[in-house]
């Protein structure tokens, strides 16, 4: 968020300052955005020529596969994401949930089209988690496997070292990564320069590899090998893992720095390295054992293993941080139960830590590493989540082009037809790998999709039941002031999800305690379909008379509601002061009771009730002092 503001401000700064700011943002983006796609050379080409595919290591096949890799990067990364998808920003924010919110804005939320788009967006988010458990596993494992080439007698330590690195990576998350994060950019710049240099060294020795730029070789390879070539597409897509991060992280850096980094360093370095690996294979087909590490001279192997390991840790960090951010967005948009979200930096708003997500990710990743044992075995599981998200992004972007930008439908149809042909081709090729490991991200995505849709549907039913039984707030307050109960000193704040209805906690308090505080505030938090809400637009309040106030605080889906900040702003507006330790917070503790009423099947209602019971307490989520909270129970039948 702060980086984007600086990028905008730079436009008004002197030219040298603007260049420096843009360069700094581009380097920072290289450290965060491009880690995943930048470490793909470790395993992509090796997997494309897997013995299971039955593709002979002839010069023609090598040129064909390298040509496929090259044009996949150009079409998907260079054109689709960088030129088209990144235009579809939601107030500067990218990512599948932000894109979904943008595509839904011009539509009636009750239509089937809106429902289908919402489901697509949520499924895309769920598939990200399927990718998030594989990226750290395959990236770190493939880097550590370089030991098998550098020092073969240490090959038995690959698995233990991988596990130790992953545990350490997740263990430090709670302390934040701001300190070491400053090194990510320069280290990844070194990584891209190194892999480019390794590629150039071998291209110079076999310059004929540059013929693969001609798409004829890709087309010829597909025509000659047909089904085998289509299976290879499932491995070619590994060069695109992380492409979605270009769009998802746009809100942190801005589109221009990401484009500068991609076109200026990342894409050229990746292309040079892949062409270098191809040149090496033409010279020495036996190098398919590990074409990336065998690019290096013998003296450079161990340094390359170390640099690769650091680069894959950085790539994993980007995915982990992305999982935290996506979870936080989903919580605010109402698709996920409340979870404890901790801010690990006072300066960077995006630096957050979600303990539940952290330890669940580590558990699943360790199970994957121990179960699959090598990056070769895991490669089959990689790709299906990425390609599914790519297809969903294309569909949602098409809706934005037509409904939000009002582009010509024929033009949009032509553009999207090309993108979908590529995306669906890759997705179909990955479906062939379901039995070999593709079931893993699909299963994770499907399970999460079921849970998220159950939560969303359940919350909708709860709101309907509450609204049906609710009492309008304004007339109730007028009646309350006309016949007031006993007033007691102090401030009471009633947190409520609907500022039009009387909070259940107030009804219970009046029923049992028969008192009303001299200063009573009804506080409602609302999440908008934009990432951030301006401070001057955040809060509205109205005086209902008699010391009663109705306050509505709006937040973007990238923000965390802040009770203390809301009360401070309200106090400034109404010339009041608040002390949290002298304020009583009244909350309704809802107990969901599954029934046979219309809504969901009884077993889904039980799942929802379990999720509801295990959601983080409002006191934890809103950072309210626990000893200042009064929870009043209420049962809701669904």
UniProtKB/Swiss-Prot annotation:
Keywords in alphabetical order, please: Cell inner membrane, Cell membrane, Ion transport, Membrane, Potassium, Potassium transport, Symport, Transmembrane, Transmembrane helix, Transport
Record carries keyword ATP-binding: no
Q: Coiled-coil region(s) at which residues?
A: none
Q: Report if keyword Membrane is assigned.
A: yes
Q: What's its catalytic activity?
A: K(+)(in) + H(+)(in) = K(+)(out) + H(+)(out)
Q: Which residues cross the membrane?
A: 25-45, 65-85, 114-134, 152-172, 184-204, 226-246, 262-282, 291-311, 352-372, 382-402, 410-430, 434-454
Q: Output a single Gene Ontology CC term carried by this record.
A: plasma membrane
Tell me which family the UniProt entry assigns to this protein.
Answer: Belongs to the HAK/KUP transporter (TC 2.A.72) family.
Annotated PANTHER family: LOW AFFINITY POTASSIUM TRANSPORT SYSTEM PROTEIN KUP, OSMOTIC STRESS POTASSIUM TRANSPORTER
Instruction: Please report the name of this protein according to its UniProt entry.
Output: Probable potassium transport system protein Kup
> What is the originating organism of this protein?
Burkholderia lata (strain ATCC 17760 / DSM 23089 / LMG 22485 / NCIMB 9086 / R18194 / 383)
The gene is kup
